[in-house]
Amino acid sequence: MMGDLTTSFPATTLTTNEQPHVVVCSGAGMGHLIPFLNLASTLSSAPYRCKVTLLIVIPLITDAESHHISSFFSSHPTIHRLDFHVNLPAPKPNVDPFFLRYKSISDSAHRLPVHLSTLAPPISAVFSDFLFTQGLNTTLPHLPNYTFTTTSARFFTLMSYVPHLAKSSSSSPVEIPGLEPFPTDNIPPPFFNPDHIFTSFTISNANYLSLSKGIIVNTFDSFEPETLSALNSGDSLPDLPPVIPIGPLNELEHNKQEELLPWLDQQPEKSVLYVSFGNRTAMSSDQILELGMGLERSDCRFIWVVKTSKIDKDDKSELRKLFGEELYVKLSEKGKLVKWVNQTEILGHTAVGGFLSHCGWNSVMEAARRGVPILAWPQHGDQRENAWVVEKAGLGVWEREWSSGIQVAIVEKVKMIMGNNDLRNSAVRVGEEAKRACDVGGSSATALMNIIGSLKR
């Protein structure tokens, strides 16, 4: 069966004027879905004008995924939807449900050729999540597969190095030629355990990255210059294909206007702190209360997205009960407590002057695009290395120690980031560089145009 599949997709030769047909294969969870929706939208629009098929992994886990996918296809009628069903294992105690889904996708990727064989016109290339790397690169070796990583170039380097990392101890920083060392505190502990579910599918896919046509990253040249240079020089990981920055990707426009915009319109410029820890970071009730008391004492206006569960369907908390009546009233007098916002609209408003963030990579790129300074409070996964990138690039500061306690530290850190003109100017510079990269003729826009152009030769 595998032998037949590998010959079913010969490389497609197009004339200069033909429209390439590309398949975009997203992974799981909002952190993976959002950049893939942005990529699909970008590829289908001018100046790239590809015919796009967007592969959606079924079943979905969160309500947010369902909502975004439905909205996306309503606003992009020319993009074809292709569902790819995987079998989810039964929930396991103390195992992240997203890890289970990631593994099911990785284990099912070898079945993709059967689904792709139904598509017309012939496929010119695939842009796929890291989770599909082994399955696509072994079953469709003649079809160009661009692996799209949804994290920073620096953390992607670490993921690519996991096959070696899992054999080592965690006692000393990880050194990869051409790059600053990776402190062990920044590395997810599972990476040192080859038997961990997350590490096992990371190793399986990392071992086949060399067969990808290229690695595309939602970053830009001036944001991670040392990492990109080291990867493309061949000094760091010599078996990798070209690593191509194409970000920050254009973001989707939402039909529904953010309900908090009228409130923001009434606030002074750069006076509001936006607080969000992403779609998968659920804080404990004690952490939430400590942060709430700190924000109340900081005397700063804010918008805070409060999340108490990794999966939105499971979040049944009532904010008034969570904070208690007295603290809830005090917080509501100074800011807004919500469970969801349109983050890009919030960050783009002139009243927003800072972002207390977990440093998920989508959030970092959205802040970079708008020049909003970040106070980094990474929680898990890639976030500590992303915070390292944020600080090095001049977009924000990473306060590594909260020794005085969350409540006291929040007061200090919030006042620092909201009143630091040097940091604000540096973040504005990053925003200008991001805009130049994705404008016509910029480094990221040109890189993506070159990829599409190569499909026509």
UniProtKB/Swiss-Prot annotation:
GO terms for molecular function: 2-hydroxyflavanone C-glucosyltransferase activity; UDP-glucosyltransferase activity. It catalyses: a 3'-hydro-2'-hydroxy-beta-oxodihydrochalcone + UDP-alpha-D-glucose = a 3'-(beta-D-glucopyranosyl)-2'-hydroxy-beta-oxodihydrochalcone + UDP + H(+). Pfam families: UDPGT. Keywords: Glycosyltransferase, Transferase. Residues 279-280 are annotated as: UDP. Optimum pH is 6.5-7.0. Optimum temperature is 50-55 degrees Celsius. Its EC number is 2.4.1.360. Belongs to the UDP-glycosyltransferase family. This is UDP-glycosyltransferase 708C2. It comes from Fagopyrum esculentum.
